[in-house]
């Protein structure tokens, strides 16, 4: 979701918009699904 899989930039922007000290995000989850989960990083 939120750009994943395939658009890590959109995921990162989504995480930054959430605030709370989040610096961005990356696509995570099962590799065979193309990393479908947007995971925020702090």
Curated annotation (Swiss-Prot):
UniProt-annotated location(s): Secreted; Target cell membrane
Task of the protein: Antimicrobial peptide that acts against Gram-positive bacteria but not against Gram-negative bacteria. It selectively inhibits peptidoglycan biosynthesis through complex formation with the cell wall precursor lipid II (1:1 molar ratio) thus inhibiting cell wall synthesis. It does not disrupt cell membranes. In vivo, is effective against an intraperitoneal infection with S.pneumoniae. In vitro, it shows very low hemolytic and cytolytic activities.
Highest taxon above the source species: Eukaryota
Binding, beta-D-GlcNAc-(1->4)-Mur2Ac(oyl-L-Ala-gamma-D-Glu-L-Lys-D-Ala-D-Ala)-di-trans,octa-cis-undecaprenyl diphosphate: 2-4, 14, 38
Family recorded in the similarity comment: Belongs to the invertebrate defensin family.
Organism listed in the record: Aspergillus amstelodami
GO terms classed as biological process: defense response to Gram-positive bacterium; immune system process
Pfam families in UniProt: Defensin_2
Further comment: The Cys-4-Pro-5 bond is in cis conformation, whereas Gly-29-Pro-30 and His-35-Pro-36 bonds are in trans conformations.
Activity relative to temperature: Has the lowest denaturation temperature of 56.5 degrees Celsius at pH 7. Binding to DPC micelles does not affect the thermal stability in alpkaline pH. Has the lowest denaturation temperature of 71.7 degrees Celsius at pH 2. Binding to DPC micelles strongly increases the thermal stability in acidic pH.
Region (Interaction site with membranes lipids): 31-35
InterPro entries, per database record: Defensin_invertebrate/fungal, Scorpion_toxin-like_sf
Keywords, ordered alphabetically: Antibiotic, Antimicrobial, Defensin, Disulfide bond, Immunity, Innate immunity, Lipid-binding, Membrane, Secreted, Target cell membrane, Target membrane
Lineage: Eukaryota, Fungi, Dikarya, Ascomycota, Pezizomycotina
Stated name of the protein: Fungal defensin eurocin
């Amino acid at each position: 979701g939120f750009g994943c899989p395939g658009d890590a930039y959109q995921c990162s922007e989504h995480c930054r918009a959430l605030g709370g000290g989040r610096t961005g995000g990356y696509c995570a989850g099962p590799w065979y699904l193309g990393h479908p989960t947007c995971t925020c990083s702090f």
